[in-house]
Structures are given as structure tokens and as C-alpha cells.
């Protein structure tokens, strides 16, 4: 606006736009707890996730004449062979991980998340990172899974999503950190 330039944001990877969360005096939060409790939880609820489209059409690029192999992007060493045991990339894999977490670990999360011998975490980080599932989908799936909206397990997990938001918030407002 200051430079007479209109910018629009189409947020698909965060629960709240970093520019929409401000202190009462208009300043920027620097500490997580007030950011999350007074900023996020007092703000409008995260947008409800949209349904998946019935069909996605892609541009035909087969005529371009180059294959992915021609680009030399794949490694010579098969370093990723063990990933398939732990991570199924894509939306389906993300949905499976979320369902598994809700079924087996969400209730008990607050106590089990710090015990390495227990599968007490969601294991959703790579799926969130690569956009295979949105934090909105996770947020509302957890809200729907808990009968008691005051559950300490639910509050604890949602605050973990809040920490993810806070890191993006800080990078947005303080890009040199």
C-alpha cells in the first residue's frame, strides 16, 4: 500500500495469516504464549478446509521432449530406499497418518509425545511441510475426534500446531532471524 502496489495473499499452508495476528496495540508478538492465547485463539477460527476437487486437469507437456531422467535429478545411490517403510508421500499417505494418529495416539498425546519408545506423535510433519495435508485439515479432524473440547491432549496438540504457526509468523515479521 505504501508503494501503491496491491498484494493479495491466498493462504493454503497456515491456520492464520501472519499479518492478521497483532497485539492490541498493533505490535507484533515475540513470545509464543501470548501470541497463541491472545492472538490466535482470540482471532477468527481457522478456515474450514475445502473438499478435494473431483477432478484436476493438467497441461499436456509430453511434447516438450525431455524426461525427468534427462534432467539428472535422481541420485545414483538408492539412499531413500528405507523411506517407504515410514512415509507414504502424498495426500493419501497424509490422511492415513492423521487417521492413525487419531485412532491410536491423540488421546494420551500430552503424556506420550515425549516418550521415544511410544508412537505418541502424529508423524505429520513431512506431510505438513510438503503441503500434502493442510493444518486446517488436521485442526478440524482433531476437534471432531475429541468429544471433550477441553481435553488437555487436544489442547496440547493444537498448541503444537500453534508453534508451527509461530515460526512462520516470526519469519514473516522478522525475516533476518
Where are these predicted regions, by residue range?
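Trp/Phe/Arg-rich N-terminal binding region typifying the photolyase-homology
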Residues: 1-47
Amino acid at each position: 500500500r505504501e508503494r501503491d502496489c496491491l498484494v493479495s495473499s491466498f493462504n493454503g499452508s497456515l491456520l492464520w495469516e501472519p499479518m492478521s495476528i497483532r497485539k492490541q496495540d498493533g505490535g507484533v508478538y515475540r513470545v509464543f504464549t501470548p501470541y497463541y492465547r491472545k492472538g490466535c485463539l482470540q482471532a477468527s477460527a481457522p478456515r474450514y478446509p475445502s473438499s478435494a476437487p473431483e477432478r484436476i486437469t493438467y497441461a499436456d507437456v509430453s511434447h516438450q521432449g525431455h524426461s525427468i531422467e534427462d534432467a539428472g535429478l535422481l541420485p545414483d545411490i538408492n539412499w531413500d530406499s528405507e523411506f517407504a517403510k515410514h512415509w507414504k508421500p502424498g495426500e493419501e499417505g497424509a490422511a492415513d497418518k492423521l487417521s492413525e494418529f487419531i485412532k491410536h495416539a491423540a488421546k494420551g498425546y500430552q503424556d506420550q509425545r515425549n516418550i521415544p519408545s511410544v508412537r505418541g506423535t502424529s508423524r505429520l510433519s513431512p506431510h505438513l511441510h510438503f503441503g500434502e495435508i493442510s493444518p486446517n485439515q488436521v485442526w478440524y479432524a482433531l476437534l471432531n475426534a475429541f468429544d471433550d473440547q477441553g481435553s488437555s491432549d487436544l489442547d496440547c496438540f493444537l498448541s503444537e500446531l500453534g508453534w508451527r504457526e509461530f515460526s512462520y509468523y516470526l519469519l514473516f515479521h522478522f525475516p533476518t532471524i
